[in-house]
Amino acid sequence: MALDPLGAVVLQSIMALSGRLALAALRLWGPGGGRRPISLCVGASGGFGGGGSSEKKFSLQDVAELLRTRACSRVVVMVGAGISTPSGIPDFRSPGSGLYSNLQQYDIPYPEAIFELGFFFHNPKPFFMLAKELYPGHYRPNVTHYFLRLLHDKELLLRLYTQNIDGLERASGIPASKLVEAHGTFVTATCTVCRRSFPGEDIWADVMADRVPRCPVCTGVVKPDIVFFGEQLPARFLLHMADFALADLLLILGTSLEVEPFASLSEAVQKSVPRLLINRDLVGPFVLSPRRKDVVQLGDVVHGVERLVDLLGWTQELLDLMQRERGKLDGQDR
């Protein structure tokens, strides 16, 4: 039976993506980023898709127009740590931070060891100290999270792929069905011995009390479903690879695009699909393999998002949404 045209495109894209991901083992190599923004449009002469320099370069205004007119309505978003730092989330890898100093009492060989299973089984306390700091509820979503929520509310968001484990996408009101949490979540937890699954709130009291949570059945350590080095990515990461074949716009915000296989997804959309990077630095394919419809907004991520929102004419809607949602979060804290 022949595939319809859209089905053929999806199949071809999945096959191409699978080939690229086969080169990057489906293992997590590590957990996943001002000045005023500078707008940079990558021209046709150096990009995929050919064409001469006379072709019109794509701009942030063009991206805004596609969204405003709903010419693009299947938006896939990729985000990293850079969207959460404005919420005040500390970097445990940065010397001088209180969290880094607190973790040093455990004689950690290097910060990333916290996410290594061997070290975790030897001494799980450093991870749970970090978990206590990052557990949902400690930090609030910022402008960028609520912009993504607004995309969902306007039925423009196909899927949001996040490297973050802070849960701020959920806290902004984006439903779980729209999320692929590539590096895991605190929403669920699993016993490392008997593999029983638990709701994340079941271990919350232990984590907040600086106790290592234990399975009530076998007494094994119960670990939040955060992806450690060498662990398989969540099944949803694979189930939604077709999203990139269906996408008509790709937004990439606040990520270094260094961690595979997440980083390879940035090249998984069709070559005709616009890609917008809002980031502190020029990264990944925007350096190595730019395309004609690439747009780069360099600088502070929040400032870049605010500029896009202004071009969209959504500023007041975003402010109203933030006020409503922050009021709800304040009510939950009482």
UniProtKB/Swiss-Prot annotation:
Enzyme class of the recorded protein, top EC level: transferase
Keyword Magnesium: no
GO cellular component, one term: membrane
Enzyme Commission number, as recorded: 2.3.1.286, 2.3.1.-
Expression induction: Sirt3 expression decreases by 50% in skeletal muscle upon fasting.
Superkingdom classification of source: Eukaryota
Disruption phenotype: Decreased muscle endurance under energetically demanding conditions. Decreased Mn-SOD activity in liver, increased mitochondrial superoxide levels and genomic instability upon exposure to ionizing radiations. In vivo ATP levels are reduced by 50 % in organs that normally express high levels of this protein. ATP levels are unchanged in organs that normally express low levels of this protein. Leads to increased mitochondrial protein acetylation. Decreased ceramide accumulation in brain mitochondria.
Active site, per annotation: H183 (proton acceptor)
GO biological process, one term: positive regulation of oxidative phosphorylation
UniProt domain Deacetylase sirtuin-type: residue ranges: 53-315
A GO molecular-function annotation: histone deacetylase activity, NAD-dependent
Catalysed transformations (reactions): N(6)-acetyl-L-lysyl-[protein] + NAD(+) + H2O = 2''-O-acetyl-ADP-D-ribose + nicotinamide + L-lysyl-[protein]; N(6)-[(S)-lactoyl]-L-lysyl-[protein] + NAD(+) + H2O = 2''-O-(S)-lactoyl-ADP-D-ribose + nicotinamide + L-lysyl-[protein]
Binding positions (NAD(+)): 80-100, 163-166, 254-256, 279-281
The entry's keywords: Cytoplasm, Metal-binding, Mitochondrion, NAD, Transferase, Transit peptide, Zinc
InterPro entries, alphabetized: DHS-like_NAD/FAD-binding_dom, NAD-dep_sirtuin_deacylases, Sirtuin, Sirtuin_cat_small_dom_sf, Sirtuin_class_I, Ssirtuin_cat_dom
Transmembrane intervals: none
Cofactor details (free text): Binds 1 zinc ion per subunit.
Cofactor: Zn(2+)
N6-succinyllysine PTM positions: K57
Quaternary context: Upon metabolic stress, forms a complex composed of FOXO3, SIRT3 and mitochondrial RNA polymerase POLRMT; the complex is recruited to mtDNA in a SIRT3-dependent manner. Also forms a complex composed of FOXO3, SIRT3, TFAM and POLRMT. Interacts with NDUFA9, ACSS1, IDH2 and GDH. Interacts with PCCA.
Described purpose of this protein according to its UniProt entry: NAD-dependent protein deacetylase. Activates or deactivates mitochondrial target proteins by deacetylating key lysine residues. Known targets include ACSS1, IDH, GDH, PDHA1, SOD2, LCAD, SDHA, MRPL12 and the ATP synthase subunit ATP5PO. Contributes to the regulation of the cellular energy metabolism. Important for regulating tissue-specific ATP levels. In response to metabolic stress, deacetylates transcription factor FOXO3 and recruits FOXO3 and mitochondrial RNA polymerase POLRMT to mtDNA to promote mtDNA transcription.
Additional remarks: Has some ability to deacetylate histones in vitro, but seeing its subcellular location, this is unlikely in vivo.
Sequence similarity: Belongs to the sirtuin family. Class I subfamily.
PANTHER family: NAD-DEPENDENT PROTEIN DEACETYLASE SIRTUIN-3, MITOCHONDRIAL (PTHR11085:SF5), NAD-DEPENDENT PROTEIN DEACYLASE SIRTUIN-5, MITOCHONDRIAL-RELATED (PTHR11085)
Name of the featured protein: NAD-dependent protein deacetylase sirtuin-3
